[in-house]
Regions:
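Membrane-proximal helix-turn-helix segments that form the acceptor-binding/catalytic region
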Residues: 100-146
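Acidic donor-binding loop of glycosyltransferase active sites
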Residues: 145, 261-278, 292
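Carbohydrate-associated surface elements
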Residues: 153, 173
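Conserved donor-binding/catalytic core segment of Leloir-type glycosyltransferases
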Residues: 184-201, 207-210, 223
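Glycosyltransferase donor-sugar binding loop
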Residues: 221-234
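Nucleotide-activated donor-binding/catalytic signature segment of Leloir-type glycosyltransferases, i.e.
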Residues: 234-257
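C-terminal amphipathic helix plus adjacent low-complexity
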Residues: 338, 345-350, 354-411
């Protein structure tokens, strides 16, 4: 099987570029993969299936959706809400009619009228204020012959949107832990938060919880790593909460080795967001590999993490109180941290191993090419193999096999 691989690649500053750099060696060990150069309009001649990585950043993925529209293929859908991407490749290129057409196709006349309001600046940009209500995923789904997604949440959303072609849930691959010494930024418990600093990552709530926690446990330090979004006044918030003197350590962009060092030096990792665009988190997956206890929002992919590796915080009226209580538990109970750590590393090995992920990718691509005939052949082969080794239909082994098959919507 000859695969044309469309994706951002290093040195682009993109989580999906890092993802592809991790996945490609394992995928190439199993099938013939050609990485398509950035800006290419079509796959190379002789390609059996094209694989398009699509995220919500128009700068990184605009050329990829252009190629997808010319040559349909399998899509790795890294985000479900794609409004920012669609706006970038329509309005961002001066094509307001295309933007209005997509809105009307997905949301009827109401969508089109709101689109006029956005264009005339009478309505805030929908990709900033209402992205989940107007995801515009059909812009990509209509050209996809099959999907790879990373959560049941996204699979259910695309099914609800009417997508009826193959859709496989494939875990985000885990990076091997590099030989990098952990870097401690403070002497007490360090709570690490990695990613863009803005309101949708619940940074205001995290800062309030940190301030409340430090009133009882002043040895706790919050480490914030990542760029600050324009318009988010972090310094003013720190000052208002009394965190501008100490209690918070700030880092902007860091390279890969420093990222691992700071992750390794954190005792707890926090990754919050609301709303979710259906995305996963590379820093959370790295944290699993390192065995770090997690605190996440109870939304999307994050809600699907096992309870024994992640404390979950609902983005509701009790969010700050729940977050403060969870952080206090982890800051004061090393035994709880140790138990969650062991569970996290086991999960990373069991579910997120890059070779296992590559096998699931190949199965998904073959299914995209072969459709129902491949489904039937795989099910027949698995059923026969299970019977040969004496696995009964009601056994624990059979239930585990069924769970694995369900990940790629077989069985």
């Amino acid at each position: 099987m000859r695969v044309a691989y469309f994706s951002p690649m290093p040195p682009e500053r993109s989580g999906i570029a890092d993802y592809s750099a991790l996945l490609l060696p394992a995928l190439r060990a199993r099938t013939d993969v050609t990485v398509v150069r950035r800006g290419a309009r079509r796959p190379p001649r002789g390609t059996d299936v094209s694989l398009y990585h699509v995220g919500n950043n128009p700068d990184a993925h605009g050329w990829i959706v252009d190629a997808l529209a010319r040559e349909p293929g399998a899509v790795v859908l890294h985000d479900f809400a794609l409004h920012h991407l669609v706006a970038g490749v329509t309005l961002g290129r001066g094509n307001r009619d295309a933007y209005l057409d997509v809105l009307e196709r997905e949301h009827g006349v109401v969508g089109r009228l709101l689109g006029y309001g956005v264009i005339d600046k009478r309505v805030p940009p929908l990709w900033e204020s209402r992205a989940l209500d107007f995801p515009l995923a059909s812009f990509v789904l209509e050209h996809a012959t099959g999907l790879v997604v990373h959560s049941r949440y996204v699979r259910d959303r695309v099914r609800a949107a009417g997508f009826d072609r193959p859709a496989a849930v494939v875990p985000h691959p885990a990076w091997p832990v590099p030989d990098v010494a952990p870097e401690r930024v403070a002497g007490g418990v360090v709570i690490g938060c990695f990613g863009v600093v803005n309101a949708s990552k619940r940074i205001p709530e995290l800062l309030r919880a940190t301030a409340a926690l430090r009133r009882k446990h002043e040895q706790v330090t919050l480490l914030l790593v990542g760029p600050t979004s324009p318009g988010f006044d972090l310094d003013r918030r720190l000052q208002r909460l009394g965190l501008d003197g100490d209690g918070v350590v700030r880092e902007e962009w860091v390279d890969e080795r420093r990222l691992w060092a700071l992750l390794g030096g954190s005792d707890v990792l926090v990754n919050l967001r609301h709303p979710t665009m259906g995305e996963t988190s590379g820093s959370v997956v790295r944290g699993l590999s390192l065995g770090k206890p997690l605190v996440v929002s109870d939304v999307g992919w994050f809600a699907e993490l096992p309870d024994d590796v992640a404390l979950k915080v609902a983005p509701d009226g009790d969010e700050v109180a729940t977050l403060t209580a969870g952080l206090e538990l982890l800051a004061t109970r090393p035994d709880v941290r140790d138990a969650m750590s062991a569970n996290a590393t086991a999960l990373a090995r069991r579910e997120h191993d890059v070779d296992r992920v590559a096998e699931l990718y190949v199965a998904a691509l073959e299914r995209t090419l072969g459709g129902g005939s491949v489904d039937d052949a795989v099910l027949h082969e698995v059923t026969a193999a299970a019977a040969d080794v004496g696995i009964s239909a009601d056994s624990a082994e059979a239930r585990e096999i069924a769970r694995r098959l369900a990940e790629v919507e077989l069985g």
